[in-house]
């Protein structure tokens, strides 16, 4: 499903909610975001949409959205999967967005009525001038997991104490507990520079 189709499927649920805000987040990124800071920024800017970005190196093989913004943080350019040669640094959207709940419901309803199919292309990119879209620049550690290569790379980064401290040090993180069999190491196994749970 596309993001727009997924949102259309949950409009009934969103309509019954009383919360003022909706935070959309994909599961392919690792960061320790303080959502209260992002929500405060969203309110301060009186934004329709707040997109969280991270300044990072990108490669031509990556699937990503590059965001350009003015000095106030208002998004004025969106490039979906831009063509680049080699590697470049850019403000990359990390698949976290904040909306006012009722605004999101209206946006999805209007988009479906107009036959829009892509949230990024039909809503974000085409409506930059009519919507108040702001960028929240996240400056902490972020790991985008887009391939086996990036999965391995970011797992190796966790061996760095500074990275672990940034992700796990300041605030508690709660996850679903899954009791499963532990790792098993044979008599001839050699393990170095590893974190084992």
Where are these regions (language model features)?
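Short, surface-exposed amphipathic charged segments that create phosphate/polyanion-binding patches used
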Residues: 1, 64-68, 93, 149-154, ...
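Conserved N-terminal catalytic core of the sugar/cofactor nucleotidyltransferase
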Residues: 1-30, 35-37
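A generic secondary-structure signal
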Residues: 9-13, 41, 55, 126
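Conserved core of the sugar-phosphate nucleotidyltransferase
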Residues: 18, 32-102
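Hydrophobic/aromatic beta-strand patches that form the interior of the parallel beta-sheet core
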Residues: 23-25, 50-52, 134-136, 143
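Flexible, glycine/proline-enriched loop segments at strand-loop-helix junctions
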Residues: 24-32, 93-94, 107-114
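Short histidine/acidic/glycine/proline-rich micro-motifs that form metal-
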Residues: 28-29, 57-58, 141-142
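Left-handed beta-helix
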Residues: 102, 110-197
